[in-house]
Amino acid sequence: MTTKKRTASSTRWMQEHFDDHYVKLAQKRGLRSRAAFKLEEIQEKDHLIKQGMTVVDLGAAPGGWSQVAAKLTGDKGKVIACDILPMDPIVGVDFLQGDFREDKVLQALLERVGQDKVDVVLSDMAPNMSGSGAVDQPRAMYLVELALDMCHQVLTPNGCFAVKVFQGEGFDDYIKTVKQAFKVVKTRKPDSSRARSREVYLVATGYKL
């Protein structure tokens, strides 16, 4: 991508961002990001998170999903969040800053989970986009594979998984892999997801491995 094209694309994104209904609504409601509405829509349809549950939130910053999850789990629940970027504190959220791809960060996250089993694993992770599909798609698929591996390590039987996936090479095979681990797998495209985005969310329930 040339500098001129990148600048035009960035300018368009900024204009869309500030004109965006969900951005304005997030600001009005005191939510960290418009992404919070994606999880709210998924929750409304699939009822993944309940009071008292333990939730792991991968790719959490700036905290939109963690805010929603903490509210749903309540005082007796627990949200353990991780991101390579910093995140301001949220009541009820135990945040670990670090690169989830690194073993030492994974181990630190597993220590936060402890002996407890996790009820829900959430992943809104995405790589830094270069603009080249040949580069970005493999990076994105690597992250969702790591998120699924996290499920295998911490998820309770009949637990749930919601993960952002970009449609493209590896997408169909990934769905097949997720279906091997969960009883029900649905594809969601929340209204708050930008129409031109290739992102969709896989919502998997009934962990069976």
Swiss-Prot record:
Stored SUPFAM superfamilies: S-adenosyl-L-methionine-dependent methyltransferases
Enzyme Commission code: 2.1.1.166
Record-listed S-adenosyl-L-methionine binding positions: G63, W65, D83, D99, D124
Annotated catalysed reactions: uridine(2552) in 23S rRNA + S-adenosyl-L-methionine = 2'-O-methyluridine(2552) in 23S rRNA + S-adenosyl-L-homocysteine + H(+)
One cellular component (GO) term of this entry: cytoplasm
Keywords: Cytoplasm, Methyltransferase, rRNA processing, S-adenosyl-L-methionine, Transferase
Subcellular location, principal: cytoplasm
One Pfam family here: FtsJ
Domain of life where this protein originates: Bacteria
rRNA processing recorded as keyword: yes
Stored PANTHER family: RIBOSOMAL RNA METHYLTRANSFERASE, RRNA METHYLTRANSFERASE 2, MITOCHONDRIAL
Listed name of the protein: Ribosomal RNA large subunit methyltransferase E
Source organism (scientific name): Shewanella frigidimarina (strain NCIMB 400)
Species lineage: Bacteria, Pseudomonadati, Pseudomonadota, Gammaproteobacteria, Alteromonadales
